[in-house]
Swiss-Prot record:
SUPFAM superfamilies: Composite domain of metallo-dependent hydrolases, Metallo-dependent hydrolases. The keyword Glycoprotein does not apply. GO terms for cellular component: cytoplasm. This is Dihydroorotase. Substrate binds at H59, L60, R61, N91, N277, H308, P322, G323. Pathway: Pyrimidine metabolism; UMP biosynthesis via de novo pathway; (S)-dihydroorotate from bicarbonate: step 3/3. GO terms for molecular function: allantoinase activity; dihydroorotase activity; zinc ion binding. Its cofactor is Zn(2+). The active site is at D304. Transmembrane segments: none annotated.
Length: 430
């Protein structure tokens, strides 16, 4: 089967070209390519072609909470958002702390076939922070687990974290830390600041995140290990990351679209959809995060896609489960916050949403150059078409988007996974 993408601009640059995909690879790039008789032609005149997006941080809820999301609906949302590979966090039921669970998640992703679903293995048994899991067995299993995290919980015991980093280094895998000192966040539901004080909400201090980021940078330095920081949310974290990188410490970090765009002023409505961990911070933090992404201090954008059913969100703010949808809106939010103001080019978007996450995770066939012979994991974006977000109109089984009724720029018009069209015109095969 052949697919011809007609009239695209690679990375949004240069002249319009046609891109011919044959089988699983890019077969030809040029102007006026003859259309094979059997080709599926996608007219994408003056649209942007990017390598398929890669998300290091999602919650697909399977196994255990399929009422909120499952691998099929999550994969559909990912494909419609331009993603070709996603990483599913281990806070499922049961926890993904053994090859039984991680291999199940991998196989389910393969069955659905819309994106490559890579399970993230737990660092500690049951996410309890005490006993290390058999990371080697998960890395050697069918899923070949590349990233380990207790996300949702912090590996807060420094000795356990140091042992995890040492173990991971020997296996050639990565530890991703949910940076939260739990003794500073007991009962916290909102950023600690004037807004939380005025609204009577228990505050989550910046220091809860920053203290763990600093500690883990030092642990990684001493262990000669890599460490990845999940969902950076404060200006102070940016400064610590900058210092650590200047010292030659092997540390990478991600930021979510919602922390780039939103701030804690939204909490005035007491709408549970705005509760998220780490919490929405102040405007100054969002500005610092945007600049850090532009400067390369923060390496990549991840969604932290966290579906929750209505009965888990439509409650009083402090009782709402934390998390937001993100897979279908991420690219548009990045365009809004980073491309429109001139902080990033489309080529930069490819770097922070495809190339860097693929490199961090060690995915050899994603985040590749747009060249002949490369895998046809591709995303086509119309930069000139806006769309209005509605939770009910998203592919996820849940509707907890913080962007309800917002009009966002840029629309994904097609996604290809190894040459197979997995989304087209905001429709998915699922």
């Amino acid at each position: 089967m052949s697919v011809l993408l007609r009239g695209v601009r690679l990375y949004g640059e240069g002249e319009q070209v046609d891109v011919l995909v044959e089988g699983e690879q890019i077969a030809n790039i040029g102007a006026g390519i003859d259309i094979p008789d059997t080709a599926d032609v996608i007219d994408a005149i003056d649209q942007v072609l990017l390598p398929g997006l890669v998300d290091l941080h999602t919650h697909l809820r399977e196994p255990g909470r399929e009422y909120a999301e499952d691998i099929e609906t999550g994969s559909a949302a990912a494909a419609l958002g331009g993603y070709t590979a996603v990483f599913a966090m281990p806070n499922t039921t049961p926890v993904a702390d053994s090859p039984v669970v991680t291999d199940h998640v991998w196989r389910r992703g393969q069955q659905v076939g819309l994106v490559d679903v890579h399970p993230v293995g737990a660092v500690t048994v049951g996410l309890a922070g005490a006993e290390l899991t058999e990371m080697g067995m998960m890395a050697a299993g069918a899923a070949q687990v590349r990233i380990f995290s207790d996300d949702g919980n912090c590996v807060h015991n420094p000795l356990v974290m140091r042992r995890a980093l040492e173990y991971a280094t020997g296996l050639g895998v990565l530890i991703a830390q949910h940076a939260e000192e739990p003794r500073l966040t007991v009962g916290a539901v909102a950023h600690e600041g004037p807004t939380a004080a005025r609204l009577g909400l228990s505050g989550w201090p910046r220091a809860a995140e920053e203290s763990i980021v600093a500690r883990d940078a030092l642990l990684a330095r001493d262990a000669g290990a890599r460490v990845h920081i999940c969902h950076a949310s404060t200006a102070g974290t940016v400064e610590i990351l900058k210092w650590a990188k200047e010292q030659g410490i092997s540390i990478t970090a991600e930021v979510t679209p919602h922390h780039l765009l939103l701030d804690d002023s939204r909490l005035a409505s007491y709408d549970g959809v705005n509760r998220v961990n780490p919490p929405l911070r102040e405007t100054a933090d969002a500005v610092a995060l945007r600049q850090a992404l532009a400067d390369g201090i923060i390496d990549c954008v991840t969604t932290d896609h966290a579906p929750h059913a209505d009965h888990e969100k439509c409650v009083e703010f402090s009782a709402a489960r934390p998390g937001m949808l993100g897979l279908q809106t991420a690219l548009s939010v990045v365009v809004h916050t980073m491309v429109v103001p001139g902080l990033l080019s489309w080529r930069d978007v490819a770097q922070v949403m495809s190339e860097n996450p693929a490199r961090i995770a060690g995915l050899p066939d994603h985040g590749r150059p747009l060249e002949v012979g490369e895998p046809a994991n591709l995303t086509v974006v119309d930069p000139d078409v806006t769309w209005t977000v509605t939770g009910d109109g998203l592919a996820s089984r849940s509707a907890n988007t913080p962007y309800e009724a917002m009009t966002l720029p840029a629309t994904v018009t097609a996604t290809l996974l190894r040459g197979k069209v997995t989304a087209r015109g905001q429709k998915s095969p699922v």
